[in-house]
Amino acid sequence: MTVRATGLPETVHIIPLGHEIDRAVKPLMNKKVDRVHLLAISPEADIDPVMREKQVNYTRKVTDHLESVSIPVQFHPVEMFDVLDVLKNVSRIIVQEKTDGNNVYVNMSACGRKTSFAVTVAAMYHEVVSYYVAADGYATGENSGKEIDHGMSIVESGNIELLQQFQIMKPKDINVELLAELYRRKMNNTPYMKSDEIINFLHERKVHGFEIKPEEKRGLDKSKHRRALLNRISRSHLEELEGQKYIEKKKIGKEFSV
């Protein structure tokens, strides 16, 4: 964790937003909040124009409410109906804020159900607090006219429930870096890494045991050293990722790729 120059960590809230106002705003009233990251669909999103304008209106109202009490808002356009896009963006913000040494809270109750699931998983994976804002009523039936001011949920009491933190099994840090590299390659249409590429990857990151590359050896020592590194890759890196179903290892003769 990076120590901030000011000495004290900031308090940051991440709020993925659906058709809600109260559930996004009420928990932060009279609280010390240094910044809010507000995630919602883009104003240019390719969806039904009526639904798009409705969401833009909610986003504007929540932003105005928060800024009126001097809470800065950073807006992030996200494909809210895409679980992976939500996971990616929430995780990116969490990692950046934690790296800066800040305290991060994630509101998982101001968005739709699928989005809420993704948000909660991201918060628990990165070990930050997620919370649920209880509704005292809903803008339906005879209360439907209240939606314009409250959103779909009406919050009066402001009861907040901190979700229990469940530990999510995750790979070692270097293996997460390896997964990230595989993902980058996939996005660039080279969705695999050969064994020598993995050796170079671990060597560049100064991973223990990979300080010396095979080509730095001579004769039989070169071949012996390379086999030892390949065995180390399998034991220390690929077995874990295969066991957790992150990768599939393909053997090609004496070589392999993932």
Task: Spell out what each predicted region is.
Residues 1-103, 117-258:
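Long, low-complexity, Lys/Arg-enriched
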Residues 103-109:
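Short glycine-rich phosphate-binding loop at a beta-alpha junction
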